[in-house]
Amino acid sequence: MLQLLVEFFSLTENQAYNNMSSKYTVTVLGGGSFGTAVANIIATNGHVSRLWMRDAARAERCQASRENTEYLPGYPLHDNLVATTDLIGSVSTSDIVVISVPSQSFREVAKLAAPHLRKDTIVISTTKGIDADGFFLMSQILEQELTDVRIGVLSGPNFAKEIVQNQYTGSVVASEHDEVLKCVQQVFSSNTFRIYSNPDRYGVELGGALKNIYAMVTGMAAALGCGHNTMAMLLTRSLAEMGRFARELGADSMTFLGLAGMGDLVLTCTSDLSRNYRVGFAVGRGKSLEQAVQEIGQVAEGVNTLRIVKKKAEELNVYMPLVDGLHAVLFDKQDLQQVIQGLMTGEMSSDVDLQGGL
């Protein structure tokens, strides 16, 4: 089986990308776990890789120890990776800029980078979230703040820790620019990290943001001791809600059958490596939302996304019972068991909307 995986990840598509002679300069803005993992892949692939951090002391420790002790302790970084606090010098000389910061900081960082980007720079977002002020996805913020650049997103079932462990991983790059798709596949792909392409940037990005909500739902279910039947029901109903919501916003609901939809949903909803899953698990065990967020010590994007999506779903009149139920528990302080009973005894509905796609 392992040999089959090795052969799969070494198929001609990835071989072609990795054998190309072009050497790129890439800056990753954001020294968290995923930004570090991405920067490390790029460095390992032989490109110039810079990892920008705000905190000078952190950057110095990372550069000296060859390890991101705060977010990926115990995993050595490639010698080609340079940790820096020089944003201007880094982005002004980069072919590709990757923004990998929490959604609350995304616009600020985009504004910092904007005056220093070269024309036609490829700018990639890896942030999975939604800006509450206008319901903007991260790539839409890039369109608002940047000019004369080519924009894309990278999303999928990707835990940073497993990426740096060289676990076999698939991800999706999405952009309306074919050259962005090809370039990211070339620069980011490796023998253990396989990049697929999709022109539906909006759908890919929505999938990455929405699944965080449902990870909290399944985390709660796990804390309550629910069985496999329950988890299967929750996953499939979550996918249906995601597809319904995305279709109303103009995305291709079929995107949600791929890595950025179903793939990311399954990963995030079934693993305690997920921060959002752990928040849900803690709440299911009786802790308040505030206690749960404090306990994990890192940003759980699903908490903010839930508020935003609940409001938007009401505006669009989209049926999202899991979103409604989770919001009732976390923010309206309704009893969890009563909410569950309400979901199970609510109005009957169809399983799959064949005309709509999901």
UniProtKB/Swiss-Prot annotation:
Enzyme class, UniProt record, top EC level: oxidoreductase
Residue runs in coiled coils: none
Localization, UniProt: Cytoplasm
Primary location group: cytoplasm
Keywords per UniProt: Cytoplasm, Lipid biosynthesis, Lipid metabolism, NAD, NADP, Nucleotide-binding, Oxidoreductase, Phospholipid biosynthesis, Phospholipid metabolism
Amino acids binding NADPH: S33, F34, R54, K128, A160, R275, V299, E301
Function per UniProt: Catalyzes the reduction of the glycolytic intermediate dihydroxyacetone phosphate (DHAP) to sn-glycerol 3-phosphate (G3P), the key precursor for phospholipid synthesis.
Name of the protein in its database record: Glycerol-3-phosphate dehydrogenase [NAD(P)+]
UniProt similarity note: Belongs to the NAD-dependent glycerol-3-phosphate dehydrogenase family.
Biological process terms in GO annotation: carbohydrate metabolic process; glycerol-3-phosphate biosynthetic process; glycerol-3-phosphate catabolic process; glycerophospholipid biosynthetic process
Higher taxonomy: Bacteria, Pseudomonadati, Pseudomonadota, Gammaproteobacteria, Cellvibrionales
Catalyzed reaction equations: sn-glycerol 3-phosphate + NAD(+) = dihydroxyacetone phosphate + NADH + H(+); sn-glycerol 3-phosphate + NADP(+) = dihydroxyacetone phosphate + NADPH + H(+)
Protein residues bound to sn-glycerol 3-phosphate: K128, G156, K211, D264, S274, R275, N276
Keyword Protease among UniProt keywords: no
One Gene Ontology CC term in the entry: cytosol
HAMAP family referenced in this protein's UniProt entry, alphabetically: NAD_Glyc3P_dehydrog
Protein EC: 1.1.1.94
Keyword Coiled coil: no
Catalytic center residues: K211
UniProt pathway annotation: Membrane lipid metabolism; glycerophospholipid metabolism
Record GO terms (molecular function): glycerol-3-phosphate dehydrogenase [NAD(P)+] activity; NAD binding
